[in-house]
């Protein structure tokens, strides 16, 4: 018999990240640290660009995202989720959104900019962040924000040697930026549209961690 406390469905990236006043994510205390390497990031971009160029009309399945709904906003009905599985990919896609909105700032159309900016957080007055951290005794929240802030100044990040960086979020943000700077994407808005409509996650929501 199926467990009614578990629900898994396919979601486009736009419905995972570009969710203003709808969905927010939190890395809970029991989660392991962010461990993706530059090699992981480069492989992800290799795969994404290859799929975009060769299999543009096909969906790109990006694995599972297992969540626990922990709060519902009484005013907006927005839900906050603990990320049980998938935090490595989720965090990296948010870093990628920051790299894209910074690197291609002058080339973005309105729709692309909205997708990218809403992936980082709400664009209303409160500007609630899409991803937060409930990691007591960890520097994860500070490290993640430092990586986002660092990309605001592309001149400062130029030539940055990521091998000397201890912050994994920052190291990978630099890796993503350096990779994309070397690539020629003919139509960046078309690529961003593909990212948000063709990248698919299997999102599973649970009522509590004990049933996972």
Residue ranges and their predicted role:
Residues 1-212:
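Glycine- and hydrophobic-rich flexible loops that cap the catalytic core of alpha/beta enzyme folds
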């Amino acid at each position: 018999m199926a467990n009614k406390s578990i629900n898994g469905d396919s979601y486009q990236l736009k419905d995972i990240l570009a969710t203003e006043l709808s969905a927010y994510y939190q890395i809970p205390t029991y989660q392991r640290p962010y461990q993706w390497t530059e090699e992981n990031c480069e492989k992800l971009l290799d795969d994404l660009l290859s799929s975009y160029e060769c299999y543009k009309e096909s969906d790109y399945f990006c694995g599972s995202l297992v969540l626990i709904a922990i709060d519902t906003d009484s005013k907006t009905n927005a839900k906050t989720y603990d990320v049980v599985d998938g935090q490595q990919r989720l965090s990296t896609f948010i870093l990628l959104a920051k790299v894209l909105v910074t690197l291609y700032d002058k080339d973005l159309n309105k729709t692309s900019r909205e997708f990218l900016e809403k992936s980082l957080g709400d664009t209303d007055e409160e500007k609630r962040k899409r991803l937060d951290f409930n990691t007591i005794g960890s520097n994860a929240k500070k490290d993640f924000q430092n990586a986002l802030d660092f990309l605001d100044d592309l001149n400062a990040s130029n030539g940055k040697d990521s091998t000397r960086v201890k912050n994994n979020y920052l190291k990978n943000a630099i890796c993503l930026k350096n990779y994309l700077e070397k690539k020629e994407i003919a139509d960046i808005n078309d690529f961003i549209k593909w990212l948000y409509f063709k990248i698919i996650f299997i999102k599973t929501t649970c009522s509590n961690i004990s049933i996972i």
